[in-house]
A protein has these predicted regions:
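Intrinsic-disorder-associated, low-complexity terminal segments enriched in Asp/Asn/His/Tyr and depleted
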Residues: 130, 138, 147, 173-176
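Short beta-strand motif preference
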Residues: 80, 92, 188-192, 301
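Hydrophobic alpha-helical membrane-insertion segments
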Residues: 120, 136-141, 149
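Auxiliary Fe-S-binding modules of radical SAM enzymes
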Residues: 1-127, 151, 155-167, 331-339, ...
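Conserved Radical SAM active-site core
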Residues: 99-122, 145, 153, 157-298, ...
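Conserved AdoMet/S-adenosylmethionine-binding subsite of the radical SAM
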Residues: 227-408
């Protein structure tokens, strides 16, 4: 079987020409794959029945990943086990965000930072605090939060006086703003995998324990997005969807397929690259190539240490490309208006979370258009690190802010179902003990 999903318009045009078809047939297939997000050839009803039959007879299928299982977190996060055609599996995460009623003021800054937390205690405290923070910051699907902020009155009309949707949609049918708005959400983020496993071997990450099995194709990368959007009935153009290439794998070690998937998502599915962020552990040739791209997501560099000595211990890739080389390459990326480079920093108790480290980070990032996302380490079996104290997290953040760096503490999402940062590892055989697991396919 050969997958159509993942082919560009030029490739589809060549395929149709080989079957004696005119170029407009390729456009019809393209529209079916990426705009309509069909699951089978039978759904591409703009194609003649005989042509659909010929494609099927010659081994062509749509080829979306199969959503084999899902686990649902208490905070609304969903983690999916995606099975590829050869049986390999990766994980993809869906994270819906609330209407901004508590912290959002309607500004772009509030929108961009809606996924972050305000306090160190919430980030460190574990699943219980994770749940309560999520319930406080996120609207529940299809339910009122007690104030009616941004919700529907049953007939679709926006009601309430505090939330984003009640401000934007007052007196109007909230369904006009998309599926997410109808469910009381402001936006959603999909976390995508780029490889089966990972070769980088970050010592604090569960995915590293898998090793690397293979790269994903562009169709398998973009196909994760299509499968998740279909599950939730998302309407591109109405619903606000953000994509983060932060799942299993190192995107810049699968650079060509990663960038092809970006083009498919932008040109085919209509998701702007400004709504995408790619995270890299620091693959220097990839960063250099990325700087030359005309269509590219935002960049997030996993810094995670303030000096090469500590970074080599927790991220052995540093022995190949040190911090200075990475920062030099990052500074050559032409930034758009209101764009910055994000530096991710996983806080490990007693390893990289002390004031001396914060001072070193400030020195590294001095003069850069930078934002720092602090990520409290998410525990995993067999990994001998521990979380920092809330006091150390708060001091670290405060020092960076005082030094002029916009610094946020990421709100952990899906920690209870191993869906949080650094926890994507589990397989079908390991899932029996995870609460909330639902089998949705074979």
């Amino acid at each position: 079987m050969s997958a159509l999903f993942g082919m560009g318009l030029g490739e589809l045009t060549e395929l149709m020409a080989g079957l004696g078809q005119k170029p407009y047939r390729a456009r019809q297939v393209w529209e079916g794959l990426y705009k309509q997000r069909v699951g089978s050839l039978e759904e591409v009803t703009t194609l003649p029945v005989l042509l659909r039959a010929e494609l099927a007879a010659t081994g062509w299928v749509v080829g979306l990943p199969v959503m084999a299982q899902t686990a649902v977190s208490v905070d609304g996060t969903e983690r999916y086990l995606m099975r590829m055609a050869d049986g390999e599996t990766v994980e993809t995460v869906w994270m819906p965000d609330g209407d901004g009623g508590e912290r959002g003021d309607g500004s772009e800054a509030a929108v961009e930072e809606a996924g972050e937390v305000e306090t160190a205690e919430e980030a460190v405290a574990g699943v219980e605090a994770d749940s309560s923070a999520a319930l406080r910051n996120d609207s529940q699907k299809g339910k009122s939060n007690g104030n009616g902020e941004g919700k529907s009155n049953g007939g679709g009309e926006a009601v309430g006086d505090g939330g984003y949707w009640s401000r934007r949609g007052a007196g109007r049918d909230i369904r006009n703003f998309g599926t997410l708005a109808e469910k009381g959400f402001r936006r959603a983020t999909i976390c995508i995998s780029s490889q089966v496993g990972c070769a980088v071997n970050c010592q604090f990450c569960l995915t590293a324990k898998l090793g690397i099995r293979r790269n994903l194709t562009a169709g398998e990368i973009a196909g994760q997005v299509a499968a998740v959007l279909n599950r939730h009935g998302i309407q591109i153009g109405k619903d606000r969807i953000n994509l983060v290439f932060m799942g299993m794998g190192e995107p810049f070690l699968n650079y060509d397929e990663f960038m092809k998937s970006v083009r498919l998502l932008v040109e085919g599915m209509g998701i702007p690259e400004s709504r995408m962020t790619v995270s890299t552990s620091g693959i220097l040739p990839g960063i250099e190539a990325f700087a030359k791209e005309t269509v590219r997501p935002k960049l997030a560099l996993s810094l995670n240490a303030s000096n090469d000595g500590v970074r080599e211990e927790i991220m052995p890739i540093t022995r190949k490309w040190n911090i200075a080389a990475l920062l030099e390459a990052v500074q050559k990326i032409p930034l758009r208006n209101r764009e910055w480079v994000t530096f991710e920093y996983v806080l490990l108790g007693g390893v990289n979370d002390q004031p001396v480290h914060a001072r070193e980070v400030l020195a590294l990032l001095a003069g850069m258009r930078a934002k720092v996302n602090l990520i409290v380490w998410n525990p995993g079996p067999g990994i001998a690190y521990h979380q920092p104290t809330p006091e150390d997290v708060a001091v670290f953040q405060g020092m960076l802010i005082e030094g002029g760096i916009a610094t946020y503490i990421r709100r952990p999402r899906g920690r209870d179902i191993y869906a949080a940062c650094g926890q994507l590892k589990r397989t079908v055989a390991e899932e029996s003990g995870v609460q909330g697991l639902v089998a949705i396919g074979v």
